[in-house]
Amino acid sequence: MRKHLNVIIAYTIMLGLIILVGIFQSWNVALSIFNMCLISAVMTIGANIQWGYAGLINFGLMGYAALGGLAAVLISVEPVQEAWVAGGFSILMSLWLIVVMVFAIRFLLKNFEKSKIRTYGIAAIIITGIIIIRVTSETSIEAIENVNPATTGFLGGLGLPIMFSWIVGAFFAAGLAFIVGKVALGLRADYLAIATLLISEIVIAIIKHEDWLTRGVKNVIGLDRPVPYEIELQTKEWFINLVAKFNSGKLDLISSITDKQAALNQLVIEGSSVFVKLCYSGLFLIVVIALLIVTQKALYSPWGRMMRAIRDNEEAANAMGKNVAKQHLLIFILGSAIVGIAGAMLVTQDGLFTPGSYQPMRYTFLIWVMVIVGGSGNNFGAILGGFAVWFLWIEAAPIAFFLINLFTVGLADTHSLKIHLIESVPYFRYLMMGMGLLLIMRYRPKGILPEKIEIK
């Protein structure tokens, strides 16, 4: 109990801050923050596995999160039959050609020694395949995108429950990580960081511009939900009775039947939103707890100790007979798969897929700040960083308004300084992020909950 005291205190403070938001702002806001903290925690677990366990820098988290979001679309959206008729066959043939290309490249890699002939052969296969795919599918793609472009204009998905996309998103991200890892993990750390960032930008560019697959920047809205809709709950008798029972004290103070009914209706509307967010909280919490248990077991297993040995002294681990390249690839795939799960969870909660919203600041560097602030190498620290940084990211505006009003209490509302400060409120979050990161790096360089090596 004593050795976990810091963890208990830190998480108690974090939970207390979220409860205070619920009391002084609203429970809707508090639960929205809590749910996004849970999704951020999943992303930080993925990043922490790569950096904290193995010392791998991955600035391409955004791309893996986007693939998770894409999985939510491809799994849950109903197939667009007209689009499949217009050009589905050609797309399937192109996919088969890609599979053939992969097997051809794999054949060259396995059966020919490293030479110019093998390199030129692989390049020829890739270039020829791209040309054939482009020529044969261009007309079909145009036909697909012209099928009711205002609402569809793409092939759609499989029409399955969206929860399946959480697993599929992990496989999508893992597949990309395998390709990237095979190509880039041999690079030096700084080059690896640049390469992963550029690859994630390529992924986002493809998702934005391949309308036949994702609708591009036209977005996909109205995705399936694993929880009830608010409007449905508001008509359910059991839910109305539950809200009435929960708020009986408030309702008893109202004497007028008409006013009491109006108050109950308002409470039902507010309660439905809170109930839906609580359902999401339960689902997300299950994922976070499951990942935490698995990653903790892995961290203190022989495999986890081997990964830390590789991280701390790669040459020594290699000399001891450990396959460093293989383990780096494995950890890179696992971390990316977890980020893919988080991406699918985010789109599931939002109910829409917006490729234009994927920005490196939000989906890569903010996640890295979370890991650094919380404590890399410590799963509890990484999760805490996800909570703390996202809480500050959202609550920066209310905090800024409070501080501005406090320090300009003697100034008129029309004063130029006060107006300028209020107009600058959206930028205070960047100031607070920078100050917070500087303070952590100065006074807690290993994070709020630093890594602890247990010798057993």
PLM regions and their residue ranges:
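Transmembrane alpha-helices and adjacent helix-loop boundaries
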Residues: M1-K456
